[in-house]
Structure formats: structure tokens, C-alpha cells
Amino acid sequence: MERINRLRAQVGASAASPPPPGGSADVFVSLRDASCPQHVYDAVLSPAALEFVAELAAAFQPQVEQLHARRQARRLETEQHGAMPHFLEEMRAIREDETWRIDPQPRALMDRRVDIGDVSPANRELLLRALNSGAQGVQVDFDDGHCPTWNNTIKGHFNVLQAARGLLEVSGQQVVENPALLVIRPRAWNMDESHMLVNGRVVPGALFDFAMHLFHNGKHLFETEMGPFLYLPKLEGYTEAALWRQIFEYTEKMLDLPHGCIKATVLIENIFAVFEMDEILYELRHHSSGLNCGMWDYTASIVVNFRKRPECLLPDRQQYVSMKSDFLRYYMDLLILTCKRRHAPATTGMVPFVLSELPTGISQAEAIEKATSSKGVEALAGSDGALVYDLALVEPVATVFTEKREKIGKAGRSAPLVFDEAFFAEKLLTLPRGDVTLKSVEMNVRVALLYVLHWLYGNGTVVVNGCIEDSATAEISRAQLWQWVYHRVPIADASQRVDAALIAEMLRKVLHEESKRKPHQPQYLEAARQLVFLISTMRFPPAFITTFLQDQEALVESLQH
């Protein structure tokens, strides 16, 4: 271990240490929304809580700015000079040293079979039902499944505060005696909390959510052996893991928590991060609860970063993109292999089915069979668990992982893959070949449009064709639309190519169908249509759809008034 520490010092694997606290910060916080009860606002945004958020934001402002500068520089390098992700030569010693492991998991995290995913904390009833579902954990989601209006965010943190203490109650229903774990997913680094400024700078959404949760709930969760546990979204490399490690260590000292008590599962949702998984685990080795596959965000990151390259043109995702596709199967295999080498939990993606809203022709039994079959393959590959959205899927999916674990225990695991860098580097960047149909264009338009429409209403998810759609699936949908328009992709079942005119036509079609299916205010429909057309055709598309939508905050407020 001393050798590894020397190597890390030599290559500068970690960012500089944060400055010591000192001096009072200049803090601005937006006023309470009229729909937010005063006691909720006061409980979350107490003077002491705001002081802690401000201190954390001020202490780490330079590192956060460096993070964004690194991201911008890499995107420029990728766009203009054709840079591609690769295993870092300067970190080879850490990857090849088989002696280091992450710290052992606390008792509460020994069973990771099923978490409920995409649970917006602003949805009080869903949060309570998820806690009482029998799952091992609840992904309390301030990111992909959450629309971060000021009202939603404050209510979300209030609900988490109550849930952590077993006080959450809805219509007489209370938290059961042994609820699922609260595993908080703060916003990703691309999102800001625009309603709080410290020293004239907007507080990163990631720091706001993390600091609020740890300040209000960290010590209580630790003392009850229920946390504090996190999911970390959209990291783009090990330097960002190093930043989180520093934030954890700083917070543990400030709140008088034991070193290493904060545990985090990193969501591998970025093409650059998949080449740095060993390094990510190493940086977080005292705080790690493993890695998780985030399939659609990961796939979208490939399309967004390499959107102009013909060899990175992604076909119809409904037909050609799944965990059976080579580039995703080897992504999962490498994640599991990396975790097993480092004694870290490895979990896989979310089953999106909403059983009560399946389309005609698909029975609940068929959906459950499809879910358990896919998770069975992942379990045999070495996954320790997965996520589901529908609470009725908890038991069948948990049973799959239990049975596969017992089967592997009796028979022994098959020969593991060898960590062959050249092999994985090729497979991870070899995308499937296939065509695009009118149906696939319409499906992407539908998902993007309905997601944006519900975002304008203040919701972070929407059900489409029996599946929950969040920002991850909206991300891949809009990214593919842009890529298909840019490359003027031919349509297999029509004598035309994908262009702006077709996108406009599809938007009108889907909009008309949606207005007949469910009443909507016309101004919301029109705003959603214009936003999806813009993000599908603009010269410089944003890195994240949520950043683009957050920038429309003034539009959202004007619609509501």
C-alpha cells in the first residue's frame, strides 16, 4: 500500500486539499415558494444547515471550477482533435497492483440484491411505499428521476429528513420497523442550485444535496447503522472521484463522523469513466460501496461525445441496443471484473417496467419473465443486484439473485474474464450496426417530448409504453435524434432521410396524439415541442438535457403564471 501511495503522489492522482474553513461567507437564498409550507422551508433551510452548505461550497469552489474546466477541455479535445478514451498509462501501476482492496462493507450493505430506482424525494407517497417495499434500498433520486424546482428540492429534503427518522407518514401509513435503506443520489455536477449563492457564485446542486442530507441526517443514520449511503452520478473520471473523497473526508471531520462512514456507489454512466474504474475505486477505497451500470446515460455519453463520427453512429436503440450488445455486455463484464478484483459490490441497471401501465399485448407475467430473465443473465455474470422501478418486481428480482447466488455457491463461478486492456478497449468502442426506421424516430421523439413536457410540469419521470422514462432515456433519445439529423441517416422503411422536417412532422404527430389521450394546457405542449425541436437540431447541442432544461427556468415560471 505504501508503494501505491508513493505512485499516487508521483502522478498527482488527487486534487489539491481544500482550504481550511475561515471567514464568513456571503449567502443568498431564494424566498419560499407560496406552495411550500413554512415549517418545511424552515426545517430544511435552518441557519445552521445553510451555514454548513455555504462552508462546503466555499471550501470546494476552486476544485469544482477545475472539474468543469477539465470537462470542457476534454470535450474540446474530443471534438476538434479526435481524442478517444483509453486506459491511462500513468495509472497503470494502480490498475496492475492486485494487492489493494476497498474497505469491507458495513453490515447494512452486505445484501444489495434490489434497490428501488428513480424515486424522487418530492414524491412523498412513492418514497414511503418504496421504504416499505421489502427492497434492500431506495435510490432517493435528486438526479435523473427528479425535477429540481426549488419547491421540489426543499420538499424532497424535508421528506428525507423525516424518512431517516421513521417519521414519514401518508394517509395513516407509516414507515415499517425495518425499512429499506435510504441511498441518496445527489444531483450530478452539471446541475446547479440556482436558488442559493455563496460569495456571488451559484452552489453546485451536488454539494447542496449532499450537504443538506449529511447535515440533517448523517449522524443519525450512522448511529442507527443505516447510513449515510450515496449513489454518485455521472462521474467522468478518477479526478472527480478524488474530489468526492475530499468532500467526504472534510464533511466527516466537520460533523464529527468516523472516517470512512460515508459509503458511495459510483454510477458508471460515462464512456471516459469506464476506462478509469480501478482508479475510481482506489480514490474512494475507504468510502466505496461499489460500482453500478447506468446503461442509457452511458450510451448517451458515447453519442454525445462522438456524435459527428460516422463510426459512432448508433442505430435504432429499441432493436439493436441492449445489455446483449457487445459494447454494453463488455462494459458490464469489465465493471463486474473490476469490482471482483477489488472486493467491491457490483450492481446492474434498472428494470423500467410499470406493470399497471403495460401496453396492449404484453401481460404482466410476460413483463416479469422478461425482467427476471435479463437479471438472471446479469446475476450469472457476477452482478450482486439491480434496481427496479415497480415495487411488485422486488420479490421476483430478489429471488433471481438469491437463486443465482446459491447456484454459483454450489457449482463455483465460471472462469473469470482476464483483464486484457487491448481487448476491452476495442470492444467498448465497437458499436452495433443496424438501421433506423420511422418507428424508431417516432419513439425517440415521443420519449423526449413527453419527458420535456412533464419536466415543465415539475416532474422528473413519465411512463411511456409501460416503461418509466427519466432523464437518462430522454438523454439518449434527444442525442440520437441530433445525430441522425446531422448524418442525414436513411430510413429503412421509407424513401427519405432523417432531417429537421421529419423531426418537426413527428413532433406534431406525437403532440396531437398526446393532446387526444390526456388534457394539457396548450402553452405547455407548444413549449415542449419547441424545446425538443431546438435540442434536436441546434448547432452545438448541450452535454446534458437537464442542463438545457434548467436554463429554461424563466420559461417554466412564465408558463406557470
Regions found by a protein language model. Name each.
Residues 66, 77-80:
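Subunit-assembly interface segments of extracellular/virion macromolecular structures
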Residues 23-35, 41-55, 59, 82-100, ...:
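Conserved alpha/beta-domain cores
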Residues 68-69, 467:
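Surface-exposed peri-terminal alpha-helical interaction modules
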Residues 4-11, 78, 515, 556-559:
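Long, compositionally biased, charged low-complexity segments
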Residues 1-32:
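Intrinsically disordered, low-structural-confidence terminal and linker regions
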Residues 154-170:
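Active-site-surrounding "flap" and adjacent substrate/cofactor-binding loops of secreted or lumenal enzymes
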Residues 62-63, 69, 113-116:
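Conserved N-terminal beta1-alpha1 strand-loop-helix module at the mouth
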